[in-house]
């Protein structure tokens, strides 16, 4: 039987360079990915390099709160 909360949680990854450029209004939008992570293996905030269609390059996408 499972104990406590679910181990796998759904998270949102957001492009960090689009968030910075959003202040200057240079970007057309903010790239976001939805994925899952294992809370026991990765207790800290997750950061992955993903493709951002608004920046047209691979950038760091960081985990955000819902």
UniProtKB/Swiss-Prot annotation:
Cell compartment(s), UniProt: Plastid, Chloroplast
One Pfam family in the UniProt entry: Ribosomal_L33
Signal peptide: none
One example GO MF annotation: structural constituent of ribosome
Coiled-coil blocks: none
GO cellular component terms listed in the entry, alphabetical order: chloroplast; ribonucleoprotein complex; ribosome
InterPro entries: Ribosomal_bL33, Ribosomal_bL33_CS, Ribosomal_bL33_sf, Ribosomal_zn-bd
GO BP term, pick one: translation
Stored HAMAP family: Ribosomal_bL33
Membership in a protein family: Belongs to the bacterial ribosomal protein bL33 family.
The name this protein goes by in its record: Large ribosomal subunit protein bL33c
Species for this entry: Barbarea verna
């Amino acid at each position: 039987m499972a104990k406590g909360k679910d181990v796998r949680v759904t998270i949102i990854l957001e492009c960090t360079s689009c968030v910075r450029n959003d202040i200057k209004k240079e970007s057309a939008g903010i790239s976001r990915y939805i994925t899952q992570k294992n809370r026991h293996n990765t207790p800290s905030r997750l950061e992955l390099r993903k493709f951002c269609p608004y920046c047209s390059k691979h950038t760091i996408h960081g985990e955000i709160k819902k």
